[in-house]
């Protein structure tokens, strides 16, 4: 998708040419799953698939918004005077939520606009289409109203929309990965301190292949909130003896020595994943820095095993993709990415093997699950921008 095609779509819907066009990427997480609300590290990257928008300012307080991805919703309208969540406003609640949270900061928001949105992220795939939308709206609002918020501040507003406006217990990784994305760079983020460091994603003869189960996952309908509550309860029990604020404060040995305090087999497994995954993420960052791709791949594999055995968030579809990927030539590693329960996995695949990889994994998946998977080679991209 480019400026011209999006502008044409906008003109067909609103009968005038747009004033500006914007883009916001999606994201993958290389490693560090379910660590962001446990005070641990994550290692995500923005990708070239994402969400586009064409925009024109209005001289009143009205908003008219349309998404080519949700055509049945039609043109949705709302006013600056009523930014409360309304289920009838469908996807427009992402824009309303960003406006609602930014309005709390005494920023001048004095007019509405017309907006045409078209994304190429697969729906409900776990590639963060919601965070992509939030950061897209942040970029548009930044431009529309001359806001002085920096990228990290806008990222935090996006998380507030998820937590306060939608009532979801999500961490900050998705918004951060997108809002702070850099081309060909992954981001090691300490979610406890918000310290971050970029790492060149120099994979040489290898590429990241995204594998889509085509099984929809709904964050609010999944066991995401249950897993978070389990980790919080395990932490509370550890804190009866240990002076820690998060599970991410522990290393593997410290956890093993004190796991008896949790006194519940399921909670021990959940907490063990959080602690060990955090350490794997740090080791993976170190491996990439040293160009040790074999070690990086082994850590990626270990992450999926933990997400399956200790955290129980994978499921038959993701396990079929990942376990089949492990058996293919030219594969360094593979794991689920995102919240799980469907959605996507990633594999680090030698470029020369990609076509055969997709064919073999695709055949096994369709034979096993009964419907085809989709595959995309990930390009690591910059964060939100005006085109």
Swiss-Prot record:
Statement: the UniProt record of this protein carries the keyword Chloroplast: no
Cross-referenced SUPFAM superfamilies: GHMP Kinase, C-terminal domain (SSF55060), Ribosomal protein S5 domain 2-like (SSF54211)
Gene Ontology CC: cytosol
Molecular-function annotations in GO: ATP binding; galactokinase activity; magnesium ion binding
Membrane-spanning segments: none
Pfam families: GalKase_gal_bdg, GHMP_kinases_C, GHMP_kinases_N
Residues binding substrate: 33-36, 224
Site residues (Transition state stabilizer), renumbered to this chain: 27
Binding positions for Mg(2+) per the UniProt entry: 130, 162
GO biological process per UniProt: galactose metabolic process
Keyword Glycoprotein among UniProt keywords: no
Cellular location(s): Cytoplasm
Name of the top EC class for this enzyme: transferase
Catalytic activity: alpha-D-galactose + ATP = alpha-D-galactose 1-phosphate + ADP + H(+)
Keyword terms of this UniProt record: ATP-binding, Carbohydrate metabolism, Cytoplasm, Galactose metabolism, Kinase, Magnesium, Metal-binding, Nucleotide-binding, Transferase
Record-listed E.C. numbers: 2.7.1.6
Primary location class: cytoplasm
Active site: 174
Residues that hold ATP according to the record: 67, 124-130
Pathway entry: Carbohydrate metabolism; galactose metabolism
Role description: Catalyzes the transfer of the gamma-phosphate of ATP to D-galactose to form alpha-D-galactose-1-phosphate (Gal-1-P).
Similarity field: Belongs to the GHMP kinase family. GalK subfamily.
Protein name per the record: Galactokinase
Organism annotation: Levilactobacillus brevis (strain ATCC 367 / BCRC 12310 / CIP 105137 / JCM 1170 / LMG 11437 / NCIMB 947 / NCTC 947) (Lactobacillus brevis)
Gene name linked to the record: galK
């Amino acid at each position: 998708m480019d400026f011209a095609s999006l502008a044409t779509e906008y003109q067909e819907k609103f009968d005038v040419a747009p004033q500006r066009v914007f883009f916001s990427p999606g994201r993958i997480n290389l490693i560090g799953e379910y660590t962001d609300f446990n005070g641990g590290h994550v290692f995500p990257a923005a990708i070239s698939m994402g969400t586009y928008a064409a925009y024109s300012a209005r001289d009143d307080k009205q908003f008219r918004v349309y998404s080519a991805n949700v055509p049945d919703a039609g043109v949705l309208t709302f006013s600056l005077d009523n930014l409360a969540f309304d289920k009838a406003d469908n996807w427009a609640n992402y824009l309303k939520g960003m406006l609602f949270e930014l309005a709390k900061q005494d920023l001048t928001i004095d007019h509405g606009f017309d907006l045409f949105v078209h994304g190429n992220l697969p729906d409900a795939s776990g590639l963060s289409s919601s965070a992509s939308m939030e950061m897209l709206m942040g970029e548009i609002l930044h431009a529309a109203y001359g806001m002085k918020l920096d990228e990290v501040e806008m990222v935090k507003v996006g998380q507030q929309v998820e937590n306060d406006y939608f009532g979801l217990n999500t961490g900050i990784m998705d918004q951060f990965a997108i809002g702070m994305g850099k081309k060909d760079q992954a981001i090691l983020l300490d979610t406890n301190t918000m310290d971050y460091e970029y790492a060149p994603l120099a994979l040489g003869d290898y590429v990241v292949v995204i594998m889509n189960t085509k099984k929809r996952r709904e964050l609010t309908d999944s066991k995401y909130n249950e897993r978070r509550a389990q980790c919080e309860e395990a932490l509370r029990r550890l804190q009866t003896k240990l002076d820690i604020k998060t599970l991410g404060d522990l290393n593997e040995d410290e956890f093993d020595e004190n796991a008896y305090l949790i006194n519940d087999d399921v909670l021990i497994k959940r907490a063990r994943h959080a602690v060990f995954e955090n350490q794997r993420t740090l080791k993976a960052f170190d491996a990439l820095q040293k160009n040790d791709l074999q070690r990086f791949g082994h850590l990626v594999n270990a992450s999926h095993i933990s997400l399956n055995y200790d955290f129980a968030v994978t499921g038959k579809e993701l396990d079929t993709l990942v376990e089949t990927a492990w058996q293919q030539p030219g594969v360094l590693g593979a794991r689920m990415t995102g919240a799980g329960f469907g959605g996507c996995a990633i594999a680090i695949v030698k470029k020369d093997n990609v076509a055969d990889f997709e064919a073999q994994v695709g055949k096994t998946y369709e034979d096993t699950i009964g419907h085809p998977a989709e595959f995309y080679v990930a390009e690591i991209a910059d964060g939100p921008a005006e085109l």
